[in-house]
Amino acid sequence: VPDNALRPADPSQSGDHAKPADAAYSVRRSSALLKRIRKSEALIDARPGLYFTGYERIGGYPVFVERAKGAKLRDVDGNIYTDYLLGFGSVVLGHAHPEVNRAVIAALQRGVNPSLIDLAHLDLAERVVELVPAADCVTFLKTGSDAVDAAVRLARAVTGRARVINYGYHGWHDWCSTSSGVPEAAKALLQSFRYNDLAHAEALFAAYPEEIACIVMMPYEIDPPAPGYLNALKELAHRNGALFILDEVRSGFRIGLGGAQAHFNVSADLSAFGKAMANGHAISALAGRRAIMGKILQLGLTVTYFRSPDAMAAALATLKVLERDNVPERLARLGARLMSGLDEAAHQAGVPAHSIGLAATPFIEFEHEHKADRDRAMRLFCNAMLSRGHLMTPAHHWFICAQMSDADIDHTVRAAGEAFAFVRRMI
């Protein structure tokens, strides 16, 4: 996608945004839109202090997108951003990818939600089984939360146990949520273990003998696993009669076509996938060994929209492009370029910060002594990057997409130099 695929609404404004010396915000904002949002009672997420604070709320109120194309998006005020949120990782090829769009449109023209299964359903199942280590069969759902929830319920059905131990974020369902509205009895059945700390997981099995149905975990959140750690956890689970479940909703098809399992040489009893699987379209997958997956009919697992052929078509097209264009390798290369550039920019600005994470999901960490200063530095940095046309969040690692270019990365690094300098002046 060319750099000018999205042009600012004002022809006089270039893709580069103003670069203030001492202010975090310089993007244009519509006062009329701001007044409308503040008065609105219809959209609960748009009101101050509610759900999307820190994610979509930028400059004091949400940014409403007008259009997204490739690695760029334009908001309703005409500001253009290089998008490092990318639908929180679901848009791996780039927004509005033409091959995915064509596949989806063709599927929609055949019918949106037929009562019977479209052949694309079978095609996609066979493709996922080809790609995912130890996956004998698969079922499809709509969200990552759905897939992980189904995996946990299946583990409980197979083992006859209720307790779960976990690492990472798995969605908002009762079994893994600690928010209000969840019964204390449900919360009591979940214990979390420290990442890369095998002894902590061993201690939980010792504390709850013959009670734990499964280990469910993200293979990594930011830092990679220590050598042998994932396989050691798998062996620990099996030794204690539990299943080993990997939540690959973020990692799957991103760090490699075989996901984290192929990347780190481990295989799970059950695996959940989503996000990058369909380039932003709503579909997820639960894959696993046949001896376990064969029990899935006992769960009463039904989803009205799971047959949607448009999502199946999107996933098939996405997986085709991921493999043909070797997209995971491209993500790793671009991410490594960004991370090394950010490290150099922080050094040149004299700011104690460094890049962290895997290249396909980069992030930065400030090294100030006090947590309050580290958190403030991260907010200031992301706000300063926003004002320079780069959409990042302080609350979640970032993502790379296939439509980003070396020039996009280099532009981001130049902006980061100014953002780090701003942070240094403010803290």
Q: Over which residues does each language-model region extend?
A:
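Structural signature of PLP-dependent enzymes
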Residues: D22, T318-S340, K371-D375
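Active-site-adjacent loop/helix segments that line or gate small-molecule/cofactor pockets in enzymes
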Residues: G15-A68
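PLP-dependent enzyme catalytic core of the Aspartate aminotransferase-like
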Residues: N4-Q13, E323-D325, A384-I427
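PLP-dependent aspartate aminotransferase-fold enzymes
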Residues: D123-A213, K234, A336-M339
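Active-site core of PLP-dependent enzymes with the aminotransferase class I/II
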Residues: P219-L243
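Active-site PLP attachment segment
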Residues: F264-I296, R307-A314
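Glycine-rich loop-to-alpha-helix module at the N-terminal edge of alpha/beta enzyme cores
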Residues: D16-D22, I80-V158
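Conserved PLP-binding catalytic core of the aspartate aminotransferase-like
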Residues: V63-V65, G335-S340, Q348-C382, M404
